[in-house]
Regions:
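Short C-terminal domain-edge/linker segments immediately following a structured domain
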Residues: 20-29, 69-74, 148-155
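A generic local structural motif
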Residues: 23-27, 105-108, 141
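Histidine/acidic residue-rich metal-binding segments in metalloenzymes
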Residues: 1-39
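Short glycine/proline- and charge-enriched loop/turn segments
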Residues: 5-13, 49-52, 135-139
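A short acidic, glycine-rich active-site loop
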Residues: 12-22, 59, 141-147
Length: 172
């Protein structure tokens, strides 16, 4: 498990910092009892040089679902429905984006009038985290070589399947 006692590597400096295994167990309990409302990532894709200079964070976008699914759903801590809420519906609700009057368009539900921001996931695909295959600039990942279950196969943003061209347009 990733915690402060086992990982003193400069590349793994994060905010908030890694905690003890006791804290990690308490966090699992908080997922289980409903205390935790959201799972998200700030996706801080730093280069190796950035990390060597002490930049906190690491790439999380390409592993967040699979790691959460493996560590929380596959182990029975929470259901897949709860994970979906933690990563989609709950953040939208907390940010006020879950209604059709939202100035940015409604999100977080599969309903008419809501933006079609979706992912297609194979919940059974087993794979090994290999940061060299990440599309992001940051190849630093504490989950390197971790065996995970659950693979995001495709993403749609506002109803359009995500492609490199769409990503370039969104960034502008």
């Amino acid at each position: 498990a990733l915690n402060a006692e086992t990982d003193n590597n400069l590349k793994l400096i994060v905010n908030p910092p890694l905690r003890s295994d006791i804290d990690r167990q308490a966090l699992l309990q908080a997922f289980s009892d409903g205390t935790v409302d959201v799972i998200s990532t700030d996706h801080a894709p730093h280069t190796l040089e950035d990390k060597q200079n002490g930049a906190p964070g690491f790439s999380g976008l390409e592993t967040s679902f699979a790691v959460a699914h493996t560590e929380l759903v596959e182990t029975g801590v929470i259901s897949i429905h709860r994970l979906s809420a933690l990563m989609s519906a709950n953040p939208a609700k907390i940010l006020g984006l879950d209604n059709k009057d939202s100035f940015q368009g409604a999100r977080g539900k599969l309903e008419e009038g809501f933006l079609a921001n979706l992912v297609l996931i194979d919940l059974t695909e087993e794979w090994t985290v290999d940061s060299s295959k990440f599309k992001t600039k940051g190849k630093i990942c504490p989950f390197e070589n971790m065996e995970v279950v659950g693979k995001v196969l495709a993403t749609w943003f506002k109803g359009e399947k995500a492609t490199p061209e769409l990503c370039d347009r969104v960034r502008k």
